[in-house]
């Protein structure tokens, strides 16, 4: 007969009328009993003949995507001019005195951040924007391009101008200026002798081919005088000839063009174009070396133009033939839905490409992307704004995957010890936190996004793909992309974007200048950054509490007035560092703080309400006696695991589910097991703050017996049959708790000390978790453990009771980082009369 829920409760000793603990509890460690119960509850039955269930409520398998909804009305969020101050360390020193080693190390990590994976896969530009919304292809394309353009304008992306140069907006950092080689102007130098120059004037030498060899030439040229190629690498110095170059030929003086797809293009410049007189440079553009490459994977026509810094070339200068959009102007409409109708709507479509305020040399950057992008809702509560999702998952896959650095996240108990207090709280919202942290330009070639331009994008997605050999020469080919759908979409988009339709229809390649969200390194860097800043704030205001997890920063103070003055001081400090706060999203929590999915107050910690609603819903939808796909079980365990510490039996109750997931087997909920779990989760208990104290109760065990020292009293007992040592120690701790009621127990067993009871026999783990809930353990070496003798059956010998103090841990968050001594010449910081009447230190 299957085990009923009532019997099961009794078995786990969750009822009050259980027999004496010393007899009942060791039974739960019995292997036979555990097997019988598992069979009764149908827990370990991997061979299932019925098909698996792949959906439970909102939970589908981990890898099956919930279909995202496209919103044509999405607003692109605006990004403030985010520029984290480069002298952040000095500013912090002014604020709080010398920094600790930890703070220094963490702030250096992000100034600038570096990311150099061993292997980077380059994907064709067509994969730049993911066809995530097949019904709204064109709309999604333009919204994504607009989002990328906004990020570039805000200084978050670099724009690849050529193989070795990029441009960007916003304030440059010193490590970018080091690479700038005189910004847009390349001044030729007279180093290494003049042999290679044309006799008349300083100029640029002809190059027969430009290819990957450029780096080796740059290396060679540092070694001293070189024939012919040496000039290229000289740092700009002296010389008055200044030459400005556009798009593909990099502004660092190469007159060759390297198209992205095909090997090398050999352009031998004629002598007239290679020896340029200074006057000619100032008045005229280059002799027209222009290779119109049709649509290679970068799709740019390459021209060299003389253009003053910051000017965008208007389309009249450019070769109209090279621009897919403007070609429609001169062509006859092919139908009423021809794109030429749209192109003829306005006279000036603006530039084919825009250039940033600053230009910079980069390592070799191919005309490819390394990750795709698409748009989704900003968050479940805000569907009016979009968020850009960047898929750089290539760095987390395969043999060459990058193993991301691990970082400490406080566990629930540490968090409670830290934040559970009678303080008033508020939380700050850092806007676009990831985009605060600058990346070194050398990382740009690994983090490329972009698109191959509208014509390729539309052609690739139309059912009869018409790009054959990438020939877009003839008018017939041009009109192949005209269709009613495209026409209607573009007409609607014209109202939103106007002349920018032309700009966005061109191919573009962008690299990240600040850390992107889709790389495993970013959360680590953000956590290091905010924790260092909070550490500085904590030391500056020792009577308050500042704490952060990723971009979530909370401040606590003893009274509301004090909190407001702290808020003002901290906000000014953060703004002075260049950190952007969103004042509308500052939340004042009163005495119960909402943080990391928990509600934390003076009584302890509790899961937030929406999470409680989630698992109530989950239990309502959970099918009984039907095998559930282990991937769905992963989702269920993820949700239930979050709230497990608040239940009677904790994590051990979920062990059967964990075992199934590890074995990649379907799991079947029996009515009793489901009833047991749902009852566990209907009654939650807060996790309380641990208090410091003096340990008076000690437990110890041998495989055959147990002993306790409670104050001056000693007790001992034996087990019916020998038990594994960890199991025996756990039983001894349970007896100590139930006999003395003490919530501070000394033990010499590291497994009991860790309070992780998932590796014990299942029934014992569940029961022990309930008995030892809220107990703190202190480590006592065996040689000093007063319970050691009783456990070996010797009651007569008394070891003196230890005075073992217990300090609750706050994980790796050091609240008391002692400030390094302040040099005497610094004036004392002004002390304002604190609104605290009592000297108070954080818990």
Curated annotation (Swiss-Prot):
PROSITE patterns: RT_POL. Mg(2+) binds at residues 429, 551-552. Its EC number is 2.7.7.7, 2.7.7.49, 3.1.26.4. GO terms for molecular function: DNA binding; DNA-directed DNA polymerase activity; metal ion binding; RNA-directed DNA polymerase activity; RNA-DNA hybrid ribonuclease activity. Residues 1-177 are annotated as: Terminal protein domain (TP). InterPro entries: DNA/RNA_pol_sf (IPR043502), DNApol_viral_C (IPR001462), DNApol_viral_N (IPR000201), HBV_DPOL (IPR037531), Rev_trsase/Diguanyl_cyclase (IPR043128), RT_dom (IPR000477), Viral_Replic_Matur_Polypro (IPR051320). Residues 357-600 form the Reverse transcriptase domain. Residues 219-249, 290-316 are annotated as: Disordered. It catalyses: DNA(n) + a 2'-deoxyribonucleoside 5'-triphosphate = DNA(n+1) + diphosphate; Endonucleolytic cleavage to 5'-phosphomonoester. GO terms for biological process: DNA replication; symbiont-mediated suppression of host innate immune response. Residues 290-299 have a biased composition (Polar residues). It holds the Pfam family RVT_1. Keywords: DNA replication, DNA-binding, DNA-directed DNA polymerase, Endonuclease, Host-virus interaction, Hydrolase, Inhibition of host innate immune response by virus, Inhibition of host RLR pathway by virus, Magnesium, Metal-binding, Multifunctional enzyme, Nuclease, Nucleotidyltransferase, RNA-directed DNA polymerase, Transferase, Viral immunoevasion. Terminal protein domain (TP) is hepadnavirus-specific. Spacer domain is highly variable and separates the TP and RT domains. Polymerase/reverse-transcriptase domain (RT) and ribonuclease H domain (RH) are similar to retrovirus reverse transcriptase/RNase H. The polymerase/reverse transcriptase (RT) and ribonuclease H (RH) domains are structured in five subdomains: finger, palm, thumb, connection and RNase H. Within the palm subdomain, the 'primer grip' region is thought to be involved in the positioning of the primer terminus for accommodating the incoming nucleotide. The RH domain stabilizes the association of RT with primer-template. Hepadnaviral virions contain probably just one P protein molecule per particle. This is Protein P. It comes from Hepatitis B virus genotype B1 subtype adw (isolate Japan/pJDW233/1988) (HBV-B).
């Amino acid at each position: 007969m299957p085990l009923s829920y009532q019997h099961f409760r009794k078995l786990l000793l969750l009822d009050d009328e259980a027999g004496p603990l010393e007899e009942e509890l060791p039974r739960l460690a019995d292997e036979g009993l555990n097997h019988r119960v598992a069979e009764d509850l149908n827990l370990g039955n991997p061979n299932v003949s019925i098909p698996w269930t792949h959906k439970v409520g909102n939970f589908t398998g981990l890898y099956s995507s919930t279909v995202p909804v496209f919103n044509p009305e999405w607003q692109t969020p605006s990004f403030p001019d985010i520029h984290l101050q480069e002298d952040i360390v000095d500013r912090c020193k002014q604020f709080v005195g010398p920094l600790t080693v930890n703070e220094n190390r963490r702030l250096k990590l992000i100034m600038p951040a570096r990311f150099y994976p061993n292997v980077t896969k380059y994907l064709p530009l067509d994969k730049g924007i993911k066809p995530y919304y097949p019904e709204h292809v064109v709309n999604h394309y333009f919204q994504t391009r607009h989002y990328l353009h906004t990020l570039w304008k805000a200084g978050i992306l670099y724009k690849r101008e050529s193989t070795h140069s990029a441009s960007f907006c916003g304030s440059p950092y010193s490590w970018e200026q080091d690479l700038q080689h005189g910004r847009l102007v390349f001044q030729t130098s007279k180093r290494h002798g003049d042999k290679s120059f044309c006799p008349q004037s300083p100029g640029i030498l002809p190059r027969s081919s430009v290819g990957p060899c450029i780096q080796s030439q740059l290396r060679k040229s540092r070694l001293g005088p070189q024939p012919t190629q040496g000039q290229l690498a000289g740092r700009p110095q002296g010389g008055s000839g200044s030459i400005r170059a556009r798009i593909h030929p990099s502004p660092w003086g190469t007159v060759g063009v390297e198209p992205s797809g095909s090997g090398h293009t050999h352009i031998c410049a004629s002598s007239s174009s290679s020896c340029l007189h200074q006057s000619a440079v100032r008045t005229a553009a280059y002799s027209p070396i222009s290779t119109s490459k049709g649509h290679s994977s970068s799709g740019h026509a390459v021209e060299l133009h003389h253009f003053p810094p910051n000017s965008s070339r208007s389309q009249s200068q450019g070769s109209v033939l090279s621009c897919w959009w403007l070609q429609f102007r001169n062509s006859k409409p092919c139908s009423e839905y021809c794109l030429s109708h749209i192109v003829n709507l306005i006279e000036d479509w603006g530039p084919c490409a825009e250039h940033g305020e600053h230009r910079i040399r980069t390592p070799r950057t191919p005309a490819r992307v390394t990750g795709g992008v698409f748009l989704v809702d900003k968050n479940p509560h805000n569907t009016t704004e979009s968020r850009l999702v960047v898929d750089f998952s290539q760095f987390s896959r395969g043999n060459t995957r990058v193993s991301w650095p691990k970082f400490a996240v406080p566990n629930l108990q540490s968090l409670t010890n830290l934040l559970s207090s009678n303080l008033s709280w508020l939380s700050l919202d850092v806007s676009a936190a990831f985009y605060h942290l600058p990346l070194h330009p050398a990382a740009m070639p690994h983090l490329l996004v972009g698109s191959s331009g509208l014509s390729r994008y539309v052609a690739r997605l139309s059912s009869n793909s018409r790009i054959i050999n990438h020939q877009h020469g003839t008018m017939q080919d041009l009109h192949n992309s005209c269709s009613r759908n495209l026409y209607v979409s573009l007409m609607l988009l014209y109202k939103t974007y106007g002349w920018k339709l032309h700009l966005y229809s061109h191919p573009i390649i962008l690299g990240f200048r600040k850390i992107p969200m889709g790389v495993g390194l970013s959360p680590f860097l953000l956590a290091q950054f905010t924790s260092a800043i909070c550490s500085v704030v904590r030391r500056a205001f020792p009577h308050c509490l500042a704490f952060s997890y990723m971009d979530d920063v909370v401040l606590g103070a003893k009274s509301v007035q004090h909190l407001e003055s702290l808020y003002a001081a901290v906000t000014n400090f953060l703004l002075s560092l260049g950190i952007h706060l969103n004042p509308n999203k500052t939340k004042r929590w009163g005495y119960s703080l909402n943080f990391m999915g928990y509600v934390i107050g003076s009584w302890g910690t509790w899961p937030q309400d929406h999470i409680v609603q989630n698992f109530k819903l989950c239990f309502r939808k959970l099918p009984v006696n039907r095998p559930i796909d282990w991937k769905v079980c992963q989702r269920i365990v993820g949700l239930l695991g979050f709230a497990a510490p608040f239940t009677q039996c904790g994590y051990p109750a979920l062990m059967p589910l964990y075992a199934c997931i590890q074995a990649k087997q379907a799991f079947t909920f029996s009515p009793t097991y489901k009833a047991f779990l749902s009852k566990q989760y209907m009654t939650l208990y807060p996790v309380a703050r641990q208090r410091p104290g003096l340990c008076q109760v000690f437990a110890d065990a041998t495989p055959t017996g147990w002993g306790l020292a409670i104050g001056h009293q000693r007790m001992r007992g034996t087990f019916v049959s020998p038990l594994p040592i960890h199991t025996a120690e756990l039983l001894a701790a349970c007896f100590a708790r139930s006999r003395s009621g003490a919530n501070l127990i000394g033990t010499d067993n590291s497994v009991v000390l860790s309070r992780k009871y998932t590796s014990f026999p299942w029934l014992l783990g569940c029961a022990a978790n309930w008995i030892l809930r809220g107990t703190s353990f202190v480590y006592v070496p065996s040689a000093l453990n007063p319970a050691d003798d009783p456990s070996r059956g010797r009651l007569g010998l008394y070891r003196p009771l230890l005075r073992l103090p217990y300090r609750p841990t706050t994980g790796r968050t050091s609240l008391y980082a002692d400030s390094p001594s302040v040099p005497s010449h610094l004036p004392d910081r002004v002390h304002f009369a604190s609104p605290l009447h009592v000297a108070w230190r954080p818990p």
